[in-house]
Every structure is written in structure tokens, then in C-alpha cells.
A protein has these predicted regions:
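Conserved ABC ATPase "signature" region
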Residues: 111-128
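Catalytic Walker B motif of ABC-type/P-loop ATPase nucleotide-binding domains
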Residues: 159-160, 165-169
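The feature captures the beta-strand-to-loop junction immediately N-terminal to the Walker
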Residues: 34-36
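Helix-to-loop junction immediately C-terminal to a conserved catalytic motif
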Residues: 49
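ABC ATPase nucleotide-binding domains
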Residues: 232-233, 237-261
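H-loop/switch region of ABC-family ATPase nucleotide-binding domains
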Residues: 200-201
Length: 261
């Protein structure tokens, strides 16, 4: 199955924010969304998540327009991790992650009591479970919110369905080690059938882990396809205005590496 969009055009204050004639993203794959600041990446992610009510009919999940989805059913099928996740009250980490389980209140998982810890473990943040959220570092907060969205789409064994994670810069606040830990986790989730769309700014990080990259520019998808085909110096210079060269990399997948001047 897939997450699709048709004639996705979003205009606000006479400014075209999105103009995407057609888009089809397969589940079970890691899709990296790249592009310069202001290209429309976060706007597209929000539209695909159902946050832009004017284009709900143009986006389909499991073959159904988002406008036809029940709110709780949609929350169980997809989770959005925005760039900013303000928490106005003094919650502890367990409380934050437990919020992701709210859509499942009417059909709790057999392991419901353990899912918060399971999600924190996957996000590399279990040791923070009893900490006050406001005392965490930026990177620790990012991993806690990643655990929250993991908990949100945790599938019920009696109600299996396609699941999607829509992540806006999930690695931005993380150190080098945690960036790669999170990207490996996302790859593992795709092997379980989860569809992942991640906005990234590190082109080499996208090239190392993504199955497909989508390069946006001025509200449009400039180029999309396999990493080794799309991430070429000519595209980087045209879209970002940065000169680079592609270095060979002899791994099992034959992925290359971009070196910047």
C-alpha cells in the first residue's frame, strides 16, 4: 500500500506553498525529504499528515482520502513528529511518551503496561523514564518525542495495519552517535512494514540510510528517486548552490559519498 497525493496545491496569502501534481510513497521504505530552507518540506509533511484541511481530499492513506478518516483511526495509522514540541507543563518522561497511547484507549495492546518502556528503549532513552522533561537536554527531549510517536503507531496484534511515521528533522538535535542510531532504527522499522518520511538536512546521512530521496525546491518536488541516482553534484549545486564531488564508497549497497569544497 502507499501514501499518495494528487493535485496537491496549497496557496496562502497569495503565495504558493505546495504545487505537487502527483506523489506516491510506498510503505516499508525510508523516504528522505531534502531541500533548502523554505522549500516546503515541513508544509508537505503536515499536508500528508492531515494538518492542512483545505487539501485533505488530495491525500490518500490506504486508498482513502484523509477527509474520510476517523480522527482516532488516523492517529493510530500515522504519527507526526514536528520540529518543535513545546511542553507547557511539568511532565515527566513517562507521561510524555504515554500521551502517544491516547488514540489506543479503546483497544489497549496486550502489552500496554510495557509499551512506554519499549518505545523508550527503541529510542535510546529508557534511562530517562523517571526524569522531569524540562530538565533534559535538547537531544534527550528529541529522543523522548521520538519514543512518543513510536508508541503512537505501535500495532495491536489483533488489528494489524499499515503504519506511517512522518518525522520533521528527527536528527537535528542529536549528536553524531545518536543520529546514526536513530537512522538505523528507522531502517529497522521499514523492514517491519512501517512507512517512514523524514525531513533531513544532512545529505550524506540521507544517502547512507534512505531507500528514496525527494528533493524539494520552491514548493515543488524537483527530483525524486534512488539515492545514488539523485544525489549528484550537479543537483546539489543547482538546488543548494554548493559545490561538491561524489566519492566512491565500496559498501554492499554501492552508495556514494559527497565531499564538499
Amino acid at each position: 500500500m502507499s501514501l499518495t497525493a494528487q493535485d496537491l496545491r496549497l496557496v496562502k496569502s497569495q503565495r504558493t506553498l505546495l504545487d505537487i501534481p502527483q506523489l506516491q510513497l510506498a510503505a516499508g521504505r525510508l523516504h528522505a525529504l531534502l531541500g533548502p530552507n523554505g522549500a516546503g518540506k515541513s508544509t508537505l509533511l503536515g499536508a500528508l499528515a492531515g494538518l492542512e484541511h483545505s487539501v485533505l481530499r488530495q491525500v490518500r492513506l490506504l486508498g482513502q482520502p484523509l477527509s474520510h478518516w476517523d480522527t482516532l483511526d488516523l492517529a493510530r495509522a500515522r504519527a507526526l513528529l514536528p520540529q518543535d514540541n513545546p511542553v507547557p507543563f511539568d511532565f515527566n518522561v513517562r507521561d510524555i511518551v504515554r500521551m502517544g497511547r491516547y488514540p489506543h484507549s479503546d483497544q489497549p495492546h496486550p502489552r500496554e503496561a510495557h509499551l512506554v518502556d519499549d518505545a523508550l528503549q527503541m529510542a535510546g532513552a529508557l534511562h530517562l523514564v523517571h526524569q522531569r522533561y524540562e530538565l533534559l537536554s535538547g537531544g534527550e527531549k528529541a529522543r523522548v518525542h521520538l519514543a512518543r510517536v513510536l508508541a503512537q503507531v505501535w500495532a495491536h496484534p489483533d488489528h494489524p495495519q499499515e503504519r506511517w511515521l512522518l518525522l520533521d528533522e528527527p536528527t537535528a538535535a542529536l549528536d553524531l552517535a545518536h543520529q546514526h542510531t536513530v537512522m538505523r532504527l528507522l531502517r529497522e522499522l521499514t523492514q517491519q512494514g512501517v512507512g517512514v518520511i523524514a525531513v533531513l538536512h544532512d545529505i550524506n546521512l540521507a544517502g547512507a540510510y534512505a531507500d528514496q530521496v525527494l528533493v524539494m525546491n520552491q514548493g515543488r518536488i524537483d527530483t525524486m528517486g534512488a539515492c545514488e541516482q539523485v544525489l549528484q553534484p550537479s543537483l546539489v549545486e543547482r538546488v543548494w548552490g554548493v559545490v561538491c564531488e561524489r566519492l566512491p564508497r565500496h559498501d554492499r549497497e554501492g552508495r556514494g559519498w559527497l565531499a564538499f569544497s
